[in-house]
C-alpha cells in the first residue's frame, strides 16, 4: 500500500496533514507520496517550501492557464490524479472530510487528519524529512536574532471575520486580557497578521512589540468584495510570496514560548508543536486560542 497525502486548504492545514501522513507511512513501513496542488489558498509549490526527497505527483488537467485552482469543490478534480484510478491499494490522508467521495474507489481507503490533535509523528522526524528551505529559515533567524521575541500574538485577518472595523480593533478586550492573564511577558511580543492594518494598529498599544517590516500581504481576488463574503466564500489570493511570508511568520512563532491566537490557527498550533519539540523542558510553554470579546 502507498500512502498519498492530499495537501489542500491553507499552509497550516497542509503542514498538519503532512505530519499525519508521515507518521502513518512509518507505521505501515510504506512509501509516502505528496499531492500538493497550487491553489488560491496556497499558491506556493511544494518544492518552494521544502528541501526533501519525498516524492511528489502533480495533478493533470486541472490547472487553468493562470496556474491556480480551487480544489475540493468538484470531485472530478481528485480523479484527475491518475494514480487514484489504479488498482494498487492506496491510503489517502486528507485534512477535511470534503473528499469523502474518494472512499467509493475500491482501491482507496481514506484517513481524515484533524489538525487539532497532537502531532502523530515525531516532530524531529518531520523536520528532518521536510526541511524548510534555507531562504525561509534564514529570514526567520535574522528576525529572531535582531528582535529576540518571547511571545507571539497571531491575528488572522483575511479569511476569518475576527475584527471587522478599526473601531472593533480599538475596543477589543480579549487581546488585552490574554496578554495580561498569564503575567508579565518577559521579552518582546511578536505581532503577526495576514493583514497589515492589524499589525500597524496593535504595535502602537503594546510595549516591546515587534513586527516584520519587510513582508508582503495577501490580496483579494475581487477588489469589490471583502476578504470573506457574507456567504462564507473565500475572496483571497495567497500567492507564492504570500505563503512564503506565512512560513517565515510560522518559523518565528516556533521560537516563542507563548503563542496567542485571535482565532483557531492551525499554523500557530504547528509552530507551537515545533517549539515544544525543540524545548522539551519548557513545560509552561503554551498556545492559546482566545475568542473575540
Protein language model features and the residues they cover:
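Catalytic donor nucleotide-activated moiety binding site of glycosyltransferases and closely related
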Residues: 155-158, 184-238
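Short, well-ordered alpha-helix to beta-strand connector turns
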Residues: 148, 206, 255-257
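Active-site rim elements
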Residues: 5-9, 238-239, 243
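Short beta-alpha junction loops
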Residues: 36-42, 195-197, 290-292
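Secretory-pathway glycan-assembly enzymes, especially type II membrane glycosyltransferases
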Residues: 1-188
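A structural signal for short, well-ordered beta-strand segments and their strand-loop junctions
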Residues: 4, 31-36, 152-154, 190-192, ...
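A donor-sugar binding/catalytic signature common to diverse glycosyltransferases
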Residues: 15, 19, 246-291
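Short, flexible loop segments at the rims of nucleotide/cofactor-binding pockets, characterized by
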Residues: 130-131, 235-241
Amino acid at each position: 500500500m502507498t500512502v498519498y497525502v492530499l495537501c489542500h486548504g491553507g499552509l497550516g492545514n497542509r503542514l498538519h496533514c503532512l505530519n499525519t501522513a508521515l507518521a502513518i507511512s512509518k507505521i505501515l513501513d510504506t512509501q509516502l507520496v505528496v499531492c500538493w496542488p497550487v491553489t488560491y489558498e496556497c499558491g506556493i509549490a511544494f518544492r518552494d517550501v521544502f528541501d526533501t526527497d519525498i516524492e511528489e505527483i502533480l495533478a493533470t488537467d486541472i490547472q487553468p492557464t493562470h496556474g491556480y485552482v480551487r480544489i475540493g469543490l468538484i470531485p472530478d478534480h481528485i480523479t484527475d490524479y491518475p494514480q487514484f484510478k489504479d488498482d494498487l491499494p492506496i491510503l489517502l490522508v486528507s485534512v477535511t472530510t470534503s473528499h469523502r467521495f474518494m472512499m467509493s474507489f475500491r482501491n482507496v481507503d481514506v484517513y481524515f487528519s484533524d489538525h487539532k490533535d497532537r502531532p502523530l509523528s515525531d516532530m524531529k522526524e518531520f523536520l528532518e524529512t521536510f526541511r524548510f528551505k534555507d531562504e525561509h529559515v534564514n529570514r526567520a533567524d535574522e528576525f529572531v536574532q535582531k528582535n529576540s521575541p518571547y511571545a507571539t500574538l497571531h491575528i488572522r485577518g483575511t479569511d476569518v471575520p475576527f475584527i471587522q472595523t478599526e473601531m472593533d480593533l480599538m475596543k477589543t478586550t480579549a487581546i488585552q486580557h490574554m496578554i495580561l492573564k498569564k503575567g508579565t511577558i518577559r521579552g518582546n511580543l511578536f505581532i503577526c497578521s495576514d493583514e497589515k492594518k492589524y499589525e500597524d494598529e496593535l504595535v502602537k498599544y503594546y510595549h516591546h512589540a515587534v513586527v516584520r517590516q519587510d513582508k508582503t500581504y495577501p490580496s483579494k481576488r475581487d477588489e469589490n468584495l471583502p476578504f470573506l463574503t457574507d456567504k462564507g466564500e473565500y475572496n483571497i489570493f495567497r500567492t507564492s510570496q504570500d505563503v512564503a511570508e506565512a512560513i517565515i511568520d510560522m518559523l518565528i512563532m516556533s521560537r516563542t514560548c507563548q503563542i496567542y491566537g485571535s482565532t483557531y490557527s492551525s499554523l500557530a498550533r504547528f509552530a507551537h508543536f515545533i517549539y515544544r519539540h525543540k524545548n522539551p523542558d519548557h513545560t509552561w510553554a503554551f498556545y492559546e486560542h482566545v475568542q473575540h470579546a
